[in-house]
């Protein structure tokens, strides 16, 4: 699991994303810490919020589950990559349930294909 303190030590000071049960311990850490944090209604919105924070000098992190990757492809390719704005993506990996199987097989390859490299895929027992 990703530890909030490591990200804070790395200069990350703003967090946004869509709640995910697999990332619950990480999200709970964010909420309990009191750092700047906005819960987004969808993954694309979270990217937009993070870009806004980056534009005012806040190193940002977006959390989501990999089933939401489809919602961030356009914001990444039309906003983040062309303008060299790369918030960290913390992605909960889901891959066993039918509705998560396809994205669970291609999540890493999809991000590599579009050239986005600032991400962590969190695999584990909680991310079924």
Show where each model-derived region lies.
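Thiamine diphosphate
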Residues: 1-128
């Amino acid at each position: 699991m990703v530890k909030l303190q490591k990200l804070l030590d790395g200069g990350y000071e703003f967090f946004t994303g869509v709640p995910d049960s697999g990332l619950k311990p990480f999200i709970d850490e964010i909420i309990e810490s009191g750092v700047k944090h906005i819960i987004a209604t969808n993954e694309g919105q979270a990217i937009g919020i993070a870009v806004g924070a980056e534009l005012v000098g806040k190193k940002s992190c977006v959390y989501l589950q990999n089933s939401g990757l489809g919602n961030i492809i356009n914001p990444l390719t039309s906003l983040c990559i062309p303008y060299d704005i790369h918030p960290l993506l913390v992605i909960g990996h889901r891959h066993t349930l039918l509705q998560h199987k396809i994205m669970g097989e291609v999540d890493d390859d999809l991000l590599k294909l579009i050239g986005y490299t600032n991400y962590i895929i969190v695999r584990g027992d909680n991310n079924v």
